[in-house]
Amino acid sequence: MTDKIKEYIAEAKAFSTQNKEKLEEFRIKFLGSKGLVKDIFAEFKNVPNDQKKEFGQVINLLKTIAEEKVKTITEELESKEEIKSLYGDLSRPSEHIKIGSRHPISLIKNQIIDIFSNIGFNVSEGPEIEDDWHNFTALNLPEYHPARDMQDTFFIQTNPDILLRTHTSSVQVRYMENNKPPIRTISPGRVFRNEAVSSRSHCIFHQVEGLYIDKDVSFADMKQTLLYFTKEMFGKSKIRLRPSYFPFTEPSAEIDIYWGLKTETDYRITKGTGWLEIGGCGMVDPNVLKNCGIEPDQFNGFAFGMGIERIAMLIYQIGDIRMFYENDIRFLEQFKSTI
């Protein structure tokens, strides 16, 4: 009889299942009211006295092993049921996860930074909430200067000397105040102007402005720098500089690139001329250098600026600037391949 019980012990040890029904069959077979353990205990009275001790030990071992097996497998099955209730069927194929992407403004900004970094320009940043000195006065725009009207400004009501910057030229002022020439830096960032929101303009937009200060810097140096940029950014090798006015540069110019007239869109955006304005530039006014603590008799330089949205609209052929700020997933997910 003892040998038979040992066979049952081996069977109980070897038992394994992931099925509740089979586990219940095992429990009934070994531990049920008519199971093996109970039947074997009923035979205890017929065992010779000299074998009762060994018989009792073996049958208790069978009972313990069967109970532990039922307990262990039950816990495993309950754990899997809990995981399944929390996470679903883990064997099912996963659902498609929408991958995010960089915003088109960030893509263009980073591309501009890379282009100018290749020729030695670093990146400088500054506060979006500025004071009058850094945004206007230091840039040759003293109080009551008529050129201030060129930029409709958001002032802080409780302190009119504080405002939302209208250009990133304020960053260049701060950079010149804290760094000695030679200076070669670009200042990308968000700017604010009190303008009507339309398909072509917005009260919030992004600029990148560049500054190069050194000895014997020429207008030709500026032109070659801008020509390099337009080749890298647009693949265009023809630019022109039209005379213009900016209070912080003298002489000043508008930057045009020859876009071409290959499509109907080209005719529309260039008004039939083939030329397209992308920004402004000029030689830094000596008064600006003096205001920033740089001696204009020793150093000179050039500055330029352009709108990042303007460039993004050209490259991605986007017709409405408002699309950059509406957070429409149908628009933004078109750029996910370029993250």
UniProtKB/Swiss-Prot annotation:
Keyword check for Cytoplasm: yes
Localization: Cytoplasm
Enzyme class: ligase
Gene Ontology process terms (BP): phenylalanyl-tRNA aminoacylation
GO molecular function: ATP binding; magnesium ion binding; phenylalanine-tRNA ligase activity; tRNA binding
Protein name: Phenylalanine--tRNA ligase alpha subunit
EC number: 6.1.1.20
Gene3D superfamilies: Bira Bifunctional Protein, Domain 2
Cellular compartments per GO CC: cytoplasm
Keywords: Aminoacyl-tRNA synthetase, ATP-binding, Cytoplasm, Ligase, Magnesium, Metal-binding, Nucleotide-binding, Protein biosynthesis
